[in-house]
Design a protein with these regions (language model features):
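Phosphate-group recognition and catalysis centered on beta-loop-alpha active-site segments
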Residues: 1-216
Length: 216
């Protein structure tokens, strides 16, 4: 099972501590701000409010804040031997092409990357370049579509909000795509339940969950 760190810490020491706890993959959220790729968890709460952005209960009206970084700066602190999950926060195929250029420029081989996103076209661009892609499933309509097998070709996995997952739904999903990733799971008992259901990986902010997943 893959233990995935939901957020990549802002120091190399904290990243190493997560790797020591069992995290094998570090997630970064990549969005494009005025055409520039930026690692950031701050997103508009609704499509009609592009100027207001939030990360949980933190809000900002600023176009860019200090917590938002270039991808290269984040990659520098991820421990050697760990993979990177780029959660692509755009449905623009041109942005996907830019992402491929960024990935190639790092010199890190495709085996060191996963790319998740919602848009089949964007994922197809990334997959065509040889990178592993995950379809991100967060809404009920997306989940129903995945249950019915409405998935893009060539996926390495689907990554699903964990509250949608139980024995029946995991079984149905795995008939269409054998690898199901659950996010974001911070309760150890829930991680144990999901592991017993056969998920292939768990995204978490909890080092105890990373330790458990890495032990499976």
């Amino acid at each position: 099972m893959l233990a995935i760190a939901h957020r990549t810490p802002r120091s190399a020491a904290d990243c190493q501590r997560l790797a020591d706890s069992g995290a094998a993959v570090f997630e970064i959220d990549l969005q494009f701000m005025a055409g520039v790729p930026v690692v950031s968890h701050f997103l508009p709460p609704w499509r009609g409010m592009p100027l207001v952005r939030h990360d949980g209960w933190r809000f900002t009206l600023r176009p860019r804040i200090s917590a938002e970084e270039d991808m290269a700066a984040v990659l520098d602190r991820i421990p050697a031997g760990c993979a990177v999950l780029v959660d692509l926060k755009t449905e623009d195929v041109l942005h996907a092409k830019t992402l491929v250029e960024l990935l190639l420029a790092t010199g890190r081989p495709p085996a060191g990357w996963y790319v998740s996103g919602k848009d089949a076209g964007a994922l197809a661009v990334v997959a065509a370049a040889g990178y592993r892609t995950w379809l991100s499933v967060s809404t009920r309509p997306e989940f129903v579509g995945a249950l019915d097998g409405l998935l893009p070709p060539g996926l390495d996995a689907i990554t699903v909000r964990h509250t949608y997952l139980d024995e029946a739904t995991v079984g149905r999903l795995r008939r269409h795509q054998p690898r199901v990733i659950a996010w974001t799971v911070d309760k150890l008992y829930r991680a144990e339940e999901l592991a017993d259901l056969g998920v292939a990986g768990i995204t978490s902010d909890n080092p105890a969950v990373h330790r458990f997943v890495a032990s499976r």
